[in-house]
Amino acid sequence: MMEPFRIHKGTAAVLMNDNIDTDQIIPKQYLKRIERTGFGKFLFDEWRYDNNRQENPNFPLNAQERKGASILITGDNFGCGSSREHAPWALADYGFRVIIAGGFADIFYMNCMKNGMLPIVMDKDMREQLAKTDAREQITVDLENEIMTTNTHRFHFTIEKMWKEKLLNGLDEISITMQYEQEIKEYERKVALH
């Protein structure tokens, strides 16, 4: 079972590039493990670090005031490319709980949900307003009411009911299956009789 997602408060990091693919999120050389943890240090690896593994001071996530951000505001078509689940793992391990983009690749969107992160589709004007939020300002994301607020703005977002219920209740595929444990046992009993 995942941790339920109801209300999240956090600061934002801004990376308004379009078409950020899963290889840019987490390069393929780091995908040799199947654990879900330990990938955050490789997030946006080729952008965050120089050839000597020193932080690139020009990369937005390396700005001191953006460290510890748990909300990522980004461009269109985020998470395109291959369907590796390691990309959401890296984002979550880094500390992101909410990703706000103009759109997401379908599989990436579902993988975010399956890993307890909330991907929000928001138009460019609203994302640009959010991006102007002071780096230290808390943004509140209220999933139940589908509202996001800053000190000066209030934004409405929508999410498909099925995904919303899964996140609100912390339900992953295993915990959903376990809700039908009795029915599964009954089916197995009937099949065994034939």
Curated annotation (Swiss-Prot):
Q: In which pathway does it act?
A: Amino-acid biosynthesis; L-leucine biosynthesis; L-leucine from 3-methyl-2-oxobutanoate: step 2/4
- Keyword Lyase among record annotations: yes
Query: EC no.?
Result: 4.2.1.33
Q: Which InterPro entries does the entry mention? A: 3-IsopropMal_deHydase_ssu, Aconitase/3IPM_dehydase_swvl, AconitaseA/IPMdHydase_ssu_swvl, IPMI_Swivel, LeuD
> What keywords is this UniProt entry annotated with?
Amino-acid biosynthesis, Branched-chain amino acid biosynthesis, Leucine biosynthesis, Lyase
Reactions mediated catalytically = (2R,3S)-3-isopropylmalate = (2S)-2-isopropylmalate
Q: Which SUPFAM superfamilies match?
A: LeuD/IlvD-like
Which cellular component terms (GO) are annotated to the entry? 3-isopropylmalate dehydratase complex
Name a GO molecular-function annotation: 3-isopropylmalate dehydratase activity
Q: Output the GO biological process annotations, alphabetical, semicolon-separated.
A: L-leucine biosynthetic process
Amino-acid biosynthesis as a keyword of this entry, yes or no, is: yes
Superkingdom classification of source: Bacteria
Subunit and interaction comment: Heterodimer of LeuC and LeuD.
Cited PANTHER family: 3-ISOPROPYLMALATE DEHYDRATASE SMALL SUBUNIT (PTHR43345:SF5), 3-ISOPROPYLMALATE DEHYDRATASE SMALL SUBUNIT 2-RELATED-RELATED (PTHR43345)
The identity of this protein, by name, is 3-isopropylmalate dehydratase small subunit
Source species, please?
A: Bacillus cereus (strain ATCC 14579 / DSM 31 / CCUG 7414 / JCM 2152 / NBRC 15305 / NCIMB 9373 / NCTC 2599 / NRRL B-3711)
